[in-house]
Curated annotation (Swiss-Prot):
GO terms for molecular function: manganese ion binding. PSII is composed of 1 copy each of membrane proteins PsbA, PsbB, PsbC, PsbD, PsbE, PsbF, PsbH, PsbI, PsbJ, PsbK, PsbL, PsbM, PsbT, PsbX, PsbY, PsbZ, Psb30/Ycf12, peripheral proteins PsbO, CyanoQ (PsbQ), PsbU, PsbV and a large number of cofactors. It forms dimeric complexes. InterPro entries: PSII_PsbY (IPR009388). One of its GO terms (cellular component) is photosystem II. It comes from Trichodesmium erythraeum (strain IMS101). The gene is psbY. This is Photosystem II reaction center protein Y.
Length: 39
């Protein structure tokens, strides 16, 4: 089975952007949650 590396080249930036967005949302959500707990 021959893997098409063009597919990887297309998907990699999309996956990187999605991962970065999820990471940032997670960080903000944790900060909000900690503020909520500290009230």
């Amino acid at each position: 089975m021959d893997f098409d590396f063009r597919l990887l080249i297309v998907l990699l930036p999309i996956l990187a952007a999605a991962g970065w967005a999820v990471f940032n949302i997670g960080v903000v959500a944790m900060q909000q949650f900690q503020k909520f707990l500290n009230k």
